[in-house]
Amino acid sequence: MKYQDLRDFIVQLEERGELKRISAPVDTHLEMTEIADRVLRAGGPALLFEQPVTRGVAQAMPVLANLFGTPQRVALGMGEELADGDWQTPLREVGSLLAFLKEPEPPKGFRDAWEKLPVFRQVLNMAPKEVRSAPCQEVVWEGADVDLARLPIQHCWPGDVAPLITWGLVVTRGPGKKRQNLGIYRQQVLSRDRVIMRWLAHRGGALDFRDHQQASSGEAFPVAVVLGCDPATILGAVTPVPDSLSEYQFAGLLRGAKTELVKCMGSDLQVPASAEIVLEGVIHPGDTAAEGPYGDHTGYYNEVSEFPVFTIDRITMRRDPIYHSTYTGKPPDEPAMLGLALNEVFVPLLQRQYPEIVDFYLPPEGCSYRLAVVSIRKQYPGHAKRVMFGIWSFLRQFMYTKFIIVVDDDVAIRDWKEVIWALTTRVDATRDTVLVDNTPIDYLDFASPVASLGSKMGLDATNKWPGETTREWGRPIVMDDVVKARVDAMWDELGL
């Protein structure tokens, strides 16, 4: 589904019955979360709250929620068309494109080179276009007008310490870098013009800030936060885009049109011209604050830690902006649905590097990425362990995967009954368990003994080959195909 911007996407979702307008007043304090959570768990539409209130005070802008509440809407956001509701095939095609761009194979001859040329031409033609004026700068708040209380920012859970900006697309650029980094980092509201930027040390924004501090000690670091962006750009920020391709360029490929950018009014950072709201400001070195606690995608409240403070100098927006928001909680939530959809993008990327992989699955119940199940065409003893370590190190997205289960290709890995059968019949607890200590772990994983550092486990649930066992290995029970066909033919007569 091709679209121009977030508003065009909303219109098309509504035409498909994938968006519901809520005209009744709904409070951004807890009520909005409860409604969005019930609708998402039922597989319902995106929601546009037209009359948000904050503790009884009416807000001027509508709130968009559950935009990516189903994998089907994620596929639509990536510019794909769905045939008969099939969202997996189009997302696999996106993954195949990324795999090709990440590691393009040398052409096998002139004809092959000619066939691949349009792909490279399309990538080159999708370089972002800078414009001088933009809808996102139609209204400008500066000085005393900057007040985050004027935005309908959600307070998601009873134990949350303050309202939280959840879908902020954070734009940064490190010193000497041409390419900007886009990342999604939550932001706790401290005051009318200050929020806490919760980015983990290995994330792109944090790395840009670290490099800036080393190169320009004592100078403020420019940051822009986009609230309400076209879906392709948001998804580009959470997709493993090759380093040779900018997220803005990838978004253009998905949308089928160049991403138009406009320079921020107070810095050289560029933001999507069609954005709804943009926060412009700086992070001052040494300016930090205690962040949290907040309910997170784990289903728990996270511990309190120090993170940099983002001071907002200016807020620019459309004349009638839409505030884009979400909540995170025990799966299923919107991040879980995103993870379910991106799972299909990951499969071709993994298969390009490891052709023996048949399928790969990140169960939503595993908090999007903490547990992975992979099936392989096993070729030699120890093969499963090679695949485990390959997955842990292949994409940044898998750095925090705590558990990997490897099975043979006769196991349907998206059926837990099949996976549990393989685990209980093909695993010896000592021989087939791989434990790796002192590895990077999600900061939010309170089960690890040290913040951001913990252990990983791999389980080899494949059939064992000579060299892996000295015993005769069991053969699965399978009915004779001729008998099955004969019973199929008589089935109606049996009255069963």
From Swiss-Prot:
The UniProt entry lists the main location of this chain as: membrane
Keyword Manganese (UniProt): yes
Specify the protein's topology with respect to the membrane. Answer: Peripheral membrane protein
**Cofactor(s) needed:** prenylated FMN; Mn(2+)
Its Gene Ontology cellular component terms are: cytosol; plasma membrane
Give the residues annotated as active site.
Answer: D296 (proton donor)
Task: Note how many cofactor molecules are bound and how.
Answer: Binds 1 prenylated FMN per subunit.
An example of a Pfam family matching this protein is: UbiD_C
Q: Where in the cell is it found?
A: Cell membrane
E.C. no: 4.1.1.98
Q: From its record, what is one biological process in GO terms?
A: ubiquinone biosynthetic process
Where Mn(2+) binds, per the record, is at N181, E247
Keywords of this entry: Cell membrane, Decarboxylase, Flavoprotein, FMN, Lyase, Manganese, Membrane, Metal-binding, Ubiquinone biosynthesis
- Sample GO molecular function, one term: metal ion binding
Binding sites annotated in the UniProt record for prenylated FMN: I184, Y185, R186, R198, W199, L200, R203, G204
Q: In which pathway does it act?
A: Cofactor biosynthesis; ubiquinone biosynthesis
Show the catalytic activity: a 4-hydroxy-3-(all-trans-polyprenyl)benzoate + H(+) = a 2-(all-trans-polyprenyl)phenol + CO2
| Job of this protein | Catalyzes the decarboxylation of 3-octaprenyl-4-hydroxy benzoate to 2-octaprenylphenol, an intermediate step in ubiquinone biosynthesis.
Q: How does it assemble?
A: Homohexamer.
Give the family this protein belongs to, as stated in its UniProt record: Belongs to the UbiD family.
Protein name (Swiss-Prot/TrEMBL): 3-octaprenyl-4-hydroxybenzoate carboxy-lyase
Organism whose genome encodes this protein? Aromatoleum aromaticum (strain DSM 19018 / LMG 30748 / EbN1)
Classification from the root reads: Bacteria, Pseudomonadati, Pseudomonadota, Betaproteobacteria, Rhodocyclales
The gene for this chain is ubiD
